[in-house]
């Protein structure tokens, strides 16, 4: 592990050579207390504590006089104390970012280029979103946008990135654990301002299994999205995704979101997500599962699946203060044909942040989860956050 740390530091120093560069860092703290009650299982109330501290060093190195080509990098050291029968201490060292990027500009178009390690996400943000090593190209014009990405996840650090679906993290592992190896392929076709400032996007995604777990399989997805203004302060986003694993059955993920900005410091969001389950349309759809565990059902350890998830949130932002209140209702789909549903539970969260100075931020988050199937079960957690930039 000492060798890994030396390699990361050496990379950081090498990248500092060349044109004038900028560098900085961040120290953060997250202290979380969790209170959980499971009366339905005749278990005593349980309290646990999680402590997470991180040190991040970043560097931006221009590679051209105009600054349109640059090399960005970031290394991190993270210390976790996870609750268990006995507390689990975990140390993580990671190269979180190593990205060469730039733009080729033409008269009426441009081409964006990115190579290296960086976070990649699909259009929905709920199917594939994790750190990956790869190459990204995008052609931009006022009429059409075309982009493509090819990457490899097997060299990134699982301990500090979004888990691959079906591939478990291990608390006992220290410093570095290779993520499950997949080759993500993403291609997007965009028509900006198709009509009345409405935007249309079509995206295909393939996740190719390169590991020895045959149950992972290859997954393929196609997404269609339409977004734009309804009027000056009201916007919408419609998305639907059809996917398949090894071409055995079809799964669907769809969402509708409305964003309203009544005041300059307030926005209100209403939406609903749908993820297919085995009983939908008499078994026409199979349970939905993405590639990475981005968004889980609040009442289920598995990926968001077999449910409707109505969501409402309101966001306040005024100068250094930012606050978000969100409520979700998790509805289990029992028989979509007969419109029979079961409410599994409710989830509420309040997230607040305050920038005391330009380099000092504090925050406080609260989350409450109520299991409506067993109304005596609930979970509450609160997190105190602090971050100092230098």
Residue spans for each PLM region:
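Sec-dependent N-terminal signal peptides
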Residues: 4-15
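Beta-barrel outer-membrane channel/assembly domains of diderm bacteria
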Residues: 17-114, 135-142, 214, 218, ...
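Surface-exposed coil loops of outer-membrane beta-barrel proteins
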Residues: 34-40, 82-95, 103-215, 220, ...
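Active-site beta-loop-alpha junctions enriched in small/polar residues
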Residues: 76-78, 151-153, 205-209, 241-243, ...
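Secondary-structure boundary elements
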Residues: 139-145, 191-197, 228-235, 244, ...
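Surface-exposed beta-loop-beta
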Residues: 199-257
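Extracellular/periplasmic loop regions
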Residues: 237-326, 338
